[in-house]
From Swiss-Prot:
Superkingdom, taxonomy of origin: Eukaryota
Region (Disordered): 111-261
Gene field: MSP2
Polymorphic region as annotated region, ranges: 44-226
GO cellular component: plasma membrane; side of membrane
Biased composition (Polar residues): 167-193, 200-228
Chief location category: membrane
Protein name: Merozoite surface protein 2
Length: 300
């Protein structure tokens, strides 16, 4: 009987110590794991913002370099092409204008050669204005001389034979009407010449086509410039999105844990719950074993 009591007591102490050790091991491991997980999450929360900021800075630098390089290349190339083309177009236009034989037509030819798109939008109205300004001065000079000659002729010889001299106002009105008719005829004759000179000159057409090519390159170059910018912004948006996702989840889980909703907590709280459950089970087993040992010791 004494042996059984002693063995039961020894067994009780061994079992209690074993359970205490296991409980301490499980509790320590789960608590340590939970603590490590919380530390890792806190480190992850602190690291991704710094990494994202560094990545966004690198992305901004690469984007700026790409934009600067492509912009400089595109602007330099298009600028050189545009200057060369406009120079050649101006020479060709002035040559065609010289053949036509009027300074105003030479100016309009240079304008068409330098910027064919703007002159095509304007239409033939601008060269018409230049030609009318040059011809009106000549017409006024010619009408003044012709009116004086006609006045002298009318004073010397009267067509009616009655010795009456025509009034100078009537002569001036007639000469002005004639000058207006001449001006209209000159403007009508000059307008198609400028158009024909611009369209028929074989040298102006290929040079105008060459001039239109840099404009097409200029219109395409902003798209090329905007491409690396779009990439840069896409990278920034992705990084910021990935950065902002983690703290939101953690903040929600922290709010839910602080409110008392343990079902929606993170892995750290679940591990703590498991460790507490295991500790309670171990305590329950210890109590049962203690009662059994005491019962055997008492009744036996």
């Amino acid at each position: 009987m004494k042996v059984i009591k002693t063995l039961s007591i020894i067994n009780f102490f061994i079992f209690v110590t074993f359970n205490i050790k296991n409980e301490s091991k499980y509790s320590n491991t789960f608590i340590n794991n939970a603590y490590n997980m919380s530390i890792r999450r806190s480190m992850e929360e602190s690291k991704p913002p710094t990494g994202a900021v560094a990545g966004s800075g690198a992305g901004a630098g690469s984007g700026a370099g790409a934009v600067a390089g492509s912009g400089a290349g595109a602007v330099a190339g298009s600028g050189a092409g545009a200057v060369a083309g406009s120079g050649a177009g101006a020479v060709a236009g002035s040559g065609a204008g010289a053949v036509a034989g009027s300074g105003a037509v030479a100016g309009s030819g240079a304008g068409n050669g330098a910027n064919p798109g703007a002159d095509a939008e304007r239409g033939p109205s601008t060269p018409a204005t230049t030609t009318t300004t040059t011809t009106t001065n000549d017409a006024e000079a010619s009408t003044s001389t012709s009116s004086e000659n006609r006045n002298h002729n009318n004073a010397e010889t009267n067509p009616k034979g009655k010795g009456e001299v025509q009034k100078p106002n009537q002569a001036n009105k007639e000469t002005q009407n004639n000058s207006n008719v001449q001006q209209d005829s000159q403007t009508k004759s000059n307008v198609p010449r400028t158009q024909d000179a611009d369209t028929k000159s074989p040298t102006a057409q290929p040079e105008q086509a060459e001039n239109s090519a840099p404009t097409a390159e200029q219109t395409e170059s902003p798209e090329l410039q905007s491409a690396p910018e779009n990439k840069g912004t896409g990278q920034h948006g992705h990084m910021h999105g990935s950065r902002n996702n983690h703290p939101q989840n953690t903040s929600d889980s922290q709010k839910e844990c602080t409110d008392g909703n343990k079902e929606n907590c993170g892995a750290a709280t679940s591990l703590l719950n498991n460790s507490s459950n295991i500790a309670s089970i171990n305590k329950f087993v210890v109590l049962i074993s203690a009662t059994l040992v005491l019962s055997f010791a008492i009744f036996i």
